[in-house]
Amino acid sequence: MEREVYKGQIVRVTEEIIEGINWERVYLPSGVIIFPINEKGQILMIEEKRPHENPPQRIKPVSGILELDKGTSEENAQREMQEEIGFKANHMEKFWTMKASGTVNNQQDFYIARGLIPSKLPNPDGEETILSIRAFDLEELREKFLNDEIRWSMSTLGFFRLYQHLKAI
């Protein structure tokens, strides 16, 4: 039987003995990851302050925790864009859902956002957390990931799916 050994604001950890082995599981919140594309065909990323990380800032896609009490996955994606970059999209395309299960468990919905129009909502994390909005050409962004100029994370898997998707169009 799975038993909870830790529950924080973001992370939950359980243990379960199966066939004499103690298996640990980490549950992370599900989320949305958005790749907004501007009128020049560039992908917008944010430079974000992260005081608990080393280094204390990072470049990443627009993203957030999926809060189903605040709407659908797509509505959450729109809200995250409004909070983090001050735009909403006329067209949202969910191009991938990544479901992780095993030791680390969560789900991420990945979106392409096009037809961006200004629409700012207050950022609940504080406006000062977003240091800048950066625009990258597809190949430039790919090179930055491959050269480790942008740190890899779960969202990097989504970028390479995006890359494959856009190259097929």
Q: Which residues does each PLM region occupy?
A:
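Nudix hydrolase/Nudix homology domain
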Residues: Q57, T103, G126-I169
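Acidic, metal-coordinating catalytic segment for phosphate/diphosphate chemistry
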Residues: E2-E39
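The catalytic Nudix box helix
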Residues: P61-W96, Y111, G126-T129, D137
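Conserved Nudix-box catalytic region and its N-terminal flanking loop in Nudix hydrolases
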Residues: L28, V32-R79, E127
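Active-site-adjacent beta-strand/loop module that shapes the phosphate/pyrophosphate-binding cleft
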Residues: T14-G20, S101-K120
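Conserved hydrophobic "DFG−1" position in protein kinase catalytic cores
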Residues: P36, M45, I112-A113, A135
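Acidic pyrophosphate-coordinating catalytic loop
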Residues: E4-Q9, N54, T97-F110
